[in-house]
A protein has these predicted regions:
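N-terminal amphipathic/basic-hydrophobic helices that include classical n-h-c signal peptides
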Residues: 1-11
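Hydrophobic helical membrane-anchoring modules
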Residues: 9, 212-213, 218-243
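N-terminal glycine-rich phosphate-binding loop and ensuing alpha1 helix
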Residues: 13-61
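Conserved acidic residues
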Residues: 15-16, 56, 77, 112, ...
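Short active-site oxyanion
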Residues: 54-59, 142, 217-218
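Short phosphate-binding loop-to-helix
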Residues: 59, 66-114, 124-134
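Conserved core of the sugar-phosphate nucleotidyltransferase
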Residues: 93-95, 113, 122-208, 213
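Catalytic metal- and UDP-sugar-binding loop of GT-A-like glycosyltransferases, i.e.
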Residues: 117
Length: 243
C-alpha cells in the first residue's frame, strides 16, 4: 500500500466528492430527486459535502438532465453527463468513479482524495465526511467507510430449503447471542479513498479499510416504499432528538 500523504491542514487540495445519481430508478421512480422531508433527497448529501468544506469539487455524476438541474440548484457541479456504458442497470460504482476521475484528468484536474457519496443517504453529515477524511489522513488508510452492526447476530441465521429451515452455522446453536462476535455491514452511505489505492484495487473495496461505526438509527437502505417511509421516520426522529 502507498502511504505517502500530504498534510490535510485547513485548506486541503486535490479532494473531490462524487455523488452518483443515475436517473433510471425502477422500484422507486425518480428516487434520487424525490421529496424527502421537504426537499429532494439528493439535496441532503450535496449540502453536507459543501458544508464539510474539505472538497475542492462537489460534483454529481448522472445521465439525467432533471437530476443535473436540481443538483446545480443546490450547489453541485455537473460538468458532463455519464456515458452510455455507465448509465445502464449493470454499471458498477467503480466504473462510474473511474469515468469521473478520467474525465477530470482530461480537463487538467487530478485528485489525490475522493469520496463517493450515494444520493439516497440523507443521514450523511458534514461532520461524518470530515471524520472520514481525518481518519484517512491520520491512519494512512486506503479507504474509510461507515458501517453499522447487524441488529441480530448473522451467525444465528437460518436458510430455507425445500420448505424447511436449517441453521446456516449450526455450530453456533448453543452460543448465547452476547457471546458471538459482533459483525458489521456497509451502511451504504459513502466511501472515502486515497485515489492511488483506489486505482490499484480496481473496485470499490480496497485493502486497509478504516471504519466509522454508525448507529442503526442513522442507517437505512432504501429499495422500496417501506424503506422510504422508514428512512423518513428515522430522519424525523433524529431531528427531534437533536433539538
Amino acid at each position: 500500500m502507498i502511504n505517502i500523504r500530504v498534510d490535510m491542514g485547513d485548506n486541503m487540495k486535490n479532494n473531490i466528492a462524487i455523488i452518483t445519481a443515475r436517473g433510471g430508478s425502477k422500484r422507486i421512480p425518480k428516487k434520487n430527486i424525490r421529496d424527502f422531508c421537504g426537499k429532494p433527497i439528493i439535496a441532503y448529501v450535496i449540502e453536507a459535502a459543501i458544508k464539510a468544506g474539505i472538497y475542492d469539487t462537489v460534483m454529481v455524476s448522472t445521465d439525467s438532465k432533471e437530476i443535473a438541474e436540481i443538483s446545480k440548484g443546490y450547489g453541485a457541479e455537473v460538468p458532463f453527463f455519464r456515458s452510455e456504458k455507465t448509465s445502464n442497470d449493470y454499471a458498477a460504482t467503480a466504473d462510474v468513479l473511474m469515468e469521473v476521475l478520467e474525465a477530470y484528468k482530461q480537463m487538467g484536474e487530478e485528485y489525490t482524495y475522493m469520496t463517493c457519496i450515494y444520493p439516497t443517504a440523507p443521514f450523511v453529515t458534514a461532520e461524518k465526511l470530515k471524520q472520514a477524511m481525518e481518519a484517512l489522513m491520520k491512519d494512512k488508510a486506503s479507504m474509510v467507510m461507515p458501517v453499522t452492526a447487524f441488529s441480530y447476530p448473522p451467525l444465528r441465521g437460518y436458510i430455507m430449503k425445500d420448505g424447511h429451515l436449517n441453521m446456516k452455522w449450526p455450530e453456533y446453536y448453543k452460543c448465547r447471542s452476547q457471546d458471538l462476535e459482533t459483525l458489521y455491514h456497509d451502511a451504504g452511505q459513502f466511501y472515502s479513498y486515497y485515489v492511488p489505492d483506489f486505482y490499484k484495487a480496481g473496485g470499490i473495496i480496497t485493502e486497509g479499510i478504516v471504519p466509522i461505526v454508525a448507529d442503526e438509527m442513522e442507517v437505512q437502505d432504501i429499495d422500496n416504499e417501506t424503506d422510504w417511509r422508514m428512512a423518513e421516520l428515522k430522519y424525523r426522529f433524529m431531528c427531534e432528538k437533536k433539538r
